[in-house]
């Protein structure tokens, strides 16, 4: 443990074995777990507010949970676990509210394919998660000759009818966040960063990087949504970007789009044409071992469906997965951003109702890649909903103490990722 939040901290530095207050390593871990989950909830609640949505129960829970972590308020292990489970349900509500806001503003996403190259003409790259920022830029660039490209978690924007209607939203350039220093340098045009994940830029593109909204970097230009003229003029000054070849990748498989195929999917499962569903998704990152998710997706049998979400999809979304034989059902379904875990859960819940079984009895395996605190909040949502047998990687969270991880293992049978072939065999029940 490492706790230095009160005046009595050991040696004026930190308590590292047991708190002067009586706090144990496991309580310190539970409080960190709770705080990191709250950060994820805050991100989704912030996006909701930007779109005019708010739920008092979310705000009230954040206040209560933070108060619980104050010095000498709560030393109960059971109470902390209850709070973490409640945080999972609060995050579920935040994701639900954000889904409502996104679809009210931009329409229900529908499946589409997105070009991954660069077209002739000036262009701006938009990264992050904020669709309202993207829409504002699209409105302000309409008729200017400046093309707009999405990056990273903005890819699902192409599925929304209100955003897709802009003809100068021409494609998606680059992959997940950790490659930005190379990809943004190569892109050549200005980049607009709306939320995470943005890194401190090298000189190669620092003068072309703009932040907006909640995002900020030292010595990088910050502009507001109501006036993007400076980045638009910058794109015009740079002029035509270097054309690049690309492929078309799929997105837009919102739960309503997927559930419109429910009769065909149910029939395909009953007739044995679909053997299993794999949800392989979450955050991407630079840590070695993330090629596990690529290998797993590539080795999933052809009679199985892969669902994905968040930037972890970039590990394999450039592959051609085709369709389930004899059905026309796509084998690869990109559900959307990390917050669209809500959509993935709606699909699982609908299937469980259709087959009259619990979610844990479905032919469904969840393989969860994580990086930051929104993924932590989603993990708590899965736990709160009682979802078991989840594989998590590439490493386990350092802030979860051995005893707390043991609790998760014993009660939910969560486990770290292992050998791809052995894991796949176990998930398929072979």
In which residue ranges do the predicted regions lie?
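Long, charge-patterned amphipathic alpha-helical coiled-coil/hairpin "stalk" segments used as oligomerization
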Residues: 383-384
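Metallocofactor- and cofactor-centric catalytic cores in central/energy metabolism, strongly enriched
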Residues: 1-351, 356-370, 375-379, 390-430
């Amino acid at each position: 443990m490492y706790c230095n939040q009160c005046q009595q901290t050991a040696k004026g530095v930190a308590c590292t074995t047991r708190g002067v207050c009586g706090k144990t390593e496991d309580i310190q871990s539970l409080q960190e777990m709770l705080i990191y989950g709250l950060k994820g909830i805050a991100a989704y609640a912030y996006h909701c507010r930007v779109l005019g949505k708010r739920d008092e129960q979310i705000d009230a829970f954040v206040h209560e949970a933070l108060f619980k972590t104050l010095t000498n308020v709560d030393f109960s292990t059971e109470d902390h676990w209850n709070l973490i489970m409640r945080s999972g349900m609060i995050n579920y509500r935040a994701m639900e509210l954000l889904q409502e806001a996104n679809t009210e503003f931009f329409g229900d996403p529908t499946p589409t394919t997105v070009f991954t190259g660069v077209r002739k003409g000036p262009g701006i790259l938009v990264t992050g998660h904020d669709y309202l920022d993207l829409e504002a830029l699209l409105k302000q660039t309409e008729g200017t000759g400046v093309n707009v490209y999405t990056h990273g978690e903005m890819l699902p924007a192409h599925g929304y009818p209100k955003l897709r209607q802009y003809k100068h939203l021409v494609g998606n350039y680059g992959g997940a966040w950790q490659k930005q220093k190379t990809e943004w340098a190569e892109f050549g045009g200005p980049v607009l960063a709306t939320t995470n994940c943005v890194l401190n830029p090298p000189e190669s593109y620092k003068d072309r990087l703009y932040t907006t909204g909640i995002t900020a970097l030292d010595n990088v230009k910050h502009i507001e949504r109501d006036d993007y003229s400076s980045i638009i003029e910058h794109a015009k000054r740079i002029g035509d970007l270097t054309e690049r070849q690309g492929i078309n990748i799929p997105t837009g498989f919102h739960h309503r789009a997927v559930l419109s195929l429910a009769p065909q999917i149910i029939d395909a499962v009953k007739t044995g044409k679909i053997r299993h569903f794999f949800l392989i998704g979450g955050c991407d990152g630079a840590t070695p071992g993330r090629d596990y998710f690529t290998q797993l997706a590539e080795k999933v049998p052809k009679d199985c469906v892969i669902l994905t979400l968040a930037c972890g999809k970039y590990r394999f979304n450039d592959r051609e997965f085709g369709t389930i034989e004899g059905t026309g059902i796509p084998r690869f379904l990109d559900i959307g951003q990390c917050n669209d875990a809500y959509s993935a859960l709606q699909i699982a819940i609908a299937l469980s109702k259709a087959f009259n079984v619990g979610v844990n009895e479905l032919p469904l395996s969840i393989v969860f890649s994580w990086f930051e605190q929104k993924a932590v909040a989603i993990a708590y949502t899965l736990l709160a909903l009682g979802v078991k047998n989840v594989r998590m990687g590439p490493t386990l969270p350092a802030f979860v103490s051995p005893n707390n991880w043991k609790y998760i293992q014993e009660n939910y049978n969560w486990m770290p990722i292992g050998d791809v072939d052995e894991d796949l065999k176990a998930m398929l029940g072979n």
